[in-house]
Structures are given as structure tokens and as C-alpha cells.
């Protein structure tokens, strides 16, 4: 597996064409989504003070985020994009995480988000309409 992952590092345009490579790509995509969200979401930590137990938040609280937008080759070409995207959401095995608890999963299959950010500076309504049309909706996740 290590050799195949190393090969993928230098062949970033490769789209899996067999079950083994699809499984490796799936695992890498899940890990990437989980890592990316972990870097953005904060956490709650128990701290003991002279007044007793309290919680300290570090980072951003994303628990109430309504939408998670995913993009990238491993996600837009995957057979199980929705399953991979769920790694962005709260997981009970990490109760201190401040990841989104419930969110609608959206997929940017055409890589338009950056362009829409630029377009929105002059034409916000046009950018919004294009995004609503082009970004795929996977529904509400829990």
C-alpha cells in the first residue's frame, strides 16, 4: 500500500480504475477531509480550576454550520462522495470536537467556488445563482 500511495503522490491526475486503487483513494480522501476539518474546527477541553471543572474552547465552533462544501478530484470522481464528506461532521468518538453536528453536504464538482468568490465582489446575485445551479446537493446529514 505504501508504494501505491507514494506513486499517487507523483501521479496526481490519476483516477482509480480498479477496486484496490478505489479503496486506497477512498481511504486517503476520508483522511484528508477529516484532517482538513480538524484544522478548522475548534475543540472543548476540560480544565480544573480552583472553582472546579470548567471547559475551555480553542478554535472555531462549527457545530451549527448549515453547509459543508467539498471539492477536489478525490471527491468529485469518487463513487461514494457522500460517505467521504461525512468525515467532515461531528463524530461521537471525539466528543470535544466542535465540528458541524448537522450539515447539508454540497459538492463543487466544477471547481467554481474560487471564481464565484471573485464574481461576487461585483455581481453577488449572479454568483449566487450560478452556485445554486452548479453545486450538487446531497441533503441533510446527521
Report residues per predicted region.
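Helical "lid/coupling" subdomains associated with nucleotide-phosphate turnover
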Residues: 1-142
